[in-house]
Amino acid sequence: MEQLNPASMDCLPDELLVEILSSLTTKQAVSTSLLSKRWKTLYSLVHNLDIDDYILFHREDGYHRYRPDIQKSFEDFVERTLAFRGHIKTFSLKSRELYAFGLGVDVVNRWICNALERGVSELHLCINSQFELPYKFFTSTTLVMLSLGRGLVCSKIPPETSLPVLKILFLYSIWFKDLTRHVVDLYYSDLPRRKAPHCHLDSLAKVTLDLHYLRYGYQKVQNYANVKNIISEIRNVKTLHLTSSAVEVISVCRKDGLPVFNNLVELMFSSRKRHRKVLPLLLERSPNLETLILSDLYRYTYGRRHRFVGIQIPANNKIKMLSFMQYQGSATELKHISHLLLKMECLEVVKVYLATEMNDLKKMQLTEDEVKLPAASSKVKIQVMGS
């Protein structure tokens, strides 16, 4: 195939040539500036920068090479590249050997701040080291997309952090040190293990627990699994969501019971028949609970010998709102609602969310059946809603 002659591209408009340069790596794009003054000017108009130390510090045979002159050359290369820029749209920085090759935090931070000062909207950092991100990074008013990885260690986040236009955040293998004490909303998915992690989660307000067992060797795993630490750490939350698999793990692993959840005001609970004993225990341990959301009630509607067993509710409960998710409309589910209405004297609102689409006639019938149910509270209102 005939090789393309750069001179033959001189007839193309600047806008098109800039687009072509933008599709190249920064190192390739820089090399075009040697062609002529026009190409040097065109390169300065490219808004995307891709900096990667791998191409400078690694030989083709795979061995590392570090020479001070190469390090200085790399720093000068990046400094010149940034100096030629006005506005920067995308800035990507990959450094696999930040400290091994003598690149200090101050140098890299200067590059990041330089890009931020030029209004960068997409920032991609892949720095395989413990790294203190500059303060200016946490208060950017132009960042729309941010990706951090791989192996980057972020030791602190300022309380004044504000990224008002950020829409996309991608984190890959990021380590946050000593930040758990500032976490407010936590989704925790894990496999129970013999030695459970210790976390400082005093600031938590909302938690979703999604614990799972490995089905292979189930009996062996459940015998040594430990969830005591994580359950103890979340005892001060205000909102708690337990998936059905988390309830299963808790029912098997917490033989010594549950802590008291004095601050818990909202509980979303999903379970199966054989683990339904966890709910009464949790309600007993949550003296200030006001909102109870039950999902998949049809799964644990029967007790032994296929007989109805109502959910045990503490006599002094303060529940004001009761919701049923995935409601099938069965007679047994209706018995559960009837049972709960008689046990909750503070109840004000009952919301029933249907599992599947139902015609208006059936929905009306369900509403009528539930409205007729006797209740301990004279203020209760029942709402039936579609899926």
Swiss-Prot record:
Coiled coil: none annotated. InterPro entries: F-box-like_dom_sf, F-box_dom, FBL60-like. Keywords: Leucine-rich repeat, Repeat. LRR repeats lie at residues 9-34, 146-173, 180-211, 219-244, 271-296. Residues 6-60 form the F-box domain. The keyword Repeat applies. Pfam families: F-box. Gene3D superfamilies: 1.20.1280.50. Signal peptide: none annotated. This is Putative F-box/LRR-repeat protein At3g44080.
